Amino acid sequence: MDNGSNQLHVLFLPYFATGHIIPLVNAARLFVFHAGVKVTILTTHHNASLFRSTIDNDVEDGHSVISIHTLRFPSTEVGLPEGIENFSSASSPELAGKVFYAIYLLQKPMEDKIREIHPDCIFSDMYLPWTVNIALELKIPRLLFNQSSYMYNSILYNLRLYKPHKSKTITSTDSISVPGLPDKIEFKLSQLTDDLIKPEDEKNAFDELLDRTRESEDRSYGIVHDTFYELEPAYADYYQKVKKTKCWQIGPISHFSSKLFRRKELINAVDESNSCAIVEWLNEQEHKSVLYVSFGSVVRFPEAQLTEIAKALEASSIPFIWVVKKDQSAETTCLLEEEKLKNKGLIIRGWAPQLTILDHSAVGGFMTHCGWNSILEAIIAGVPLVTWPVFAEQFYNEKLVEVMGLGVKVGAEVHESNGGVEISSLVIESEKIKEAIEKLMDDSKESQKIREKVIGMSEMAKNAVEEGGSSWNNLTALIDDIKNFTSTTNV
């Protein structure tokens, strides 16, 4: 306990990607609010700037202080421009590789800082597997933060266990069934992540990181998931049974934190005046008529694919908000399409206030890359999905949407190997995109059924984080468990 007091001190360590920082920092805020835990966040200067003012606002509102310790990001050592300190800022595979190496170089200074802080518990992103070793050295628990669904983890566990994808007769276009799961789950070989299908001698540094991440799970005190029991009860039960590691689900963390704190958007990059203009435009649209199109902070489609998306939006009768990268190239064709589209919708370059947009009553659909944060935020808002997975666990996340009946698919079939920074798969044509949009946004019995399911799941998500709800109780149980462990070891 901290300085001889009875206050539990938990150190939070985010991975350096915006989609990882947001839920972990929100989890840190929950610990402060929910149980009066002393919280410290360890990161770098630029990454801290993404959320520092939100933490300051929490303090102004009377909440406990969260200490933020920052280290210098080794930009010079790896040849990165100043200010690029996470993967969301990397506009090419080359820059992303340098960010990855810089994170590796930060391990020793972070270890030294952890020894200096000497917390009672480490709450670490899954992609910092070395934190389990420093936790064991300090004789404190390490909680691994796995910001993904139980279904995804169950799929991955069974693929590694049964290896149906290793059959020599399977081609990249064949479908494989994942054995042993509560539902029939099938994938094409081309949709599986590289760590499953690459030969050992072809694995890269990130594949090796995934191996270390899995190994660190079994040596951690427990795993914290950003999901809620009611979303996937069969998979929560299944995974906890086969994994035999303590697991707690405390999500949807974004809604949990926004319910307890006045600021909805965590990231400080959101321009308040731009947010107001977006809301004003949405106020003029009909109920559930707008399609929100966003592919997260990392995915960068080539010009040819952007043009096909623009054609699909132009050809449909659906008003839209489309988010594209601020530094994305805007060649003549895309500018032409943007000029045609501007009377039908909004094109936002840069970061968008996603929670604000999804919560608006005019938004009736969300075309997404199937990042887990985005799926949860859509479920909370009761907004059905058009799914377009690209990389990482996104094809597995799409299966949850499919099985739960929460959306429709564009029909992506190829998992990207380079983290979505540079798309190399075939362009999906506008007609196929338009078909998926209209299938979700029309007034057919199928789309109505999808909407009913999403709205029902939204209510369950909101109830989960109310006092006495499943995630509320899980968070309480988690903190009590760590307190009991700490008090026992300090006797």
Curated annotation (Swiss-Prot):
UDP-alpha-D-glucose binds at residues 352, 354, 369, 372-374, 377, 393-394. Its EC number is 2.4.1.192. Expressed in roots, stems and leaves. Induction: Down-regulated after wounding. Keywords: Glycosyltransferase, Transferase. The keyword Glycosyltransferase applies. GO terms for molecular function: nuatigenin 3-beta-glucosyltransferase activity; UDP-glucosyltransferase activity. It catalyses: nuatigenin + UDP-alpha-D-glucose = nuatigenin 3-beta-D-glucopyranoside + UDP + H(+); diosgenin + UDP-alpha-D-glucose = diosgenin 3-O-beta-D-glucoside + UDP + H(+); tigogenin + UDP-alpha-D-glucose = tigogenin 3-O-beta-D-glucopyranoside + UDP + H(+); solasodine + UDP-alpha-D-glucose = solasodine 3-beta-D-glucoside + UDP + H(+). One of its GO terms (biological process) is saponin biosynthetic process. It comes from the Eukaryota. It holds the Pfam family UDPGT. The keyword Transferase applies. Belongs to the UDP-glycosyltransferase family. Glucosyltransferase involved in steroid saponin biosynthesis. Catalyzes the 3-O-glucosylation of steroidal sapogenins, such as diosgenin, nuatigenin and tigogenin. Can glucosylate steroidal alkaloids, such as solanidine, solasodine and tomatidine. This is Nuatigenin 3-beta-glucosyltransferase.
